[in-house]
Amino acid sequence: MSLSTEAKAQIIAEFGRDVNDSGSSEVQIALLTAQINHLQGHFSEHKKDHHSRRGLLRMVSQRRKLLDYLKRKNVTSYTALIGRLGLRR
């Protein structure tokens, strides 16, 4: 249920500071968002997959923590990122 290598590389190229930047907060948040969106489709078919739902909740929590960190450190980057990702905030 993870993203393909090509999809990850595309996200890193789009949100990272350079091609090898996979650790910045913006890239991590974008990768988690893509993975969360991918799992949303999975749950429309598999409603009783509670094991994966726990993983989804863990990803959402991790994204929330990273968004809070980014908001504390760099508000302009935070607002730009949530606008680009289309998150409700």
From Swiss-Prot:
One of its GO terms (biological process) is translation. Part of the 30S ribosomal subunit. Forms a bridge to the 50S subunit in the 70S ribosome, contacting the 23S rRNA. Belongs to the universal ribosomal protein uS15 family. One of the primary rRNA binding proteins, it binds directly to 16S rRNA where it helps nucleate assembly of the platform of the 30S subunit by binding and bridging several RNA helices of the 16S rRNA. Forms an intersubunit bridge (bridge B4) with the 23S rRNA of the 50S subunit in the ribosome. NCBIfam families: S15_bact. PROSITE patterns: RIBOSOMAL_S15 (PS00362). Gene3D superfamilies: 6.10.250.3130, S15/NS1, RNA-binding (1.10.287.10). This is Small ribosomal subunit protein uS15.
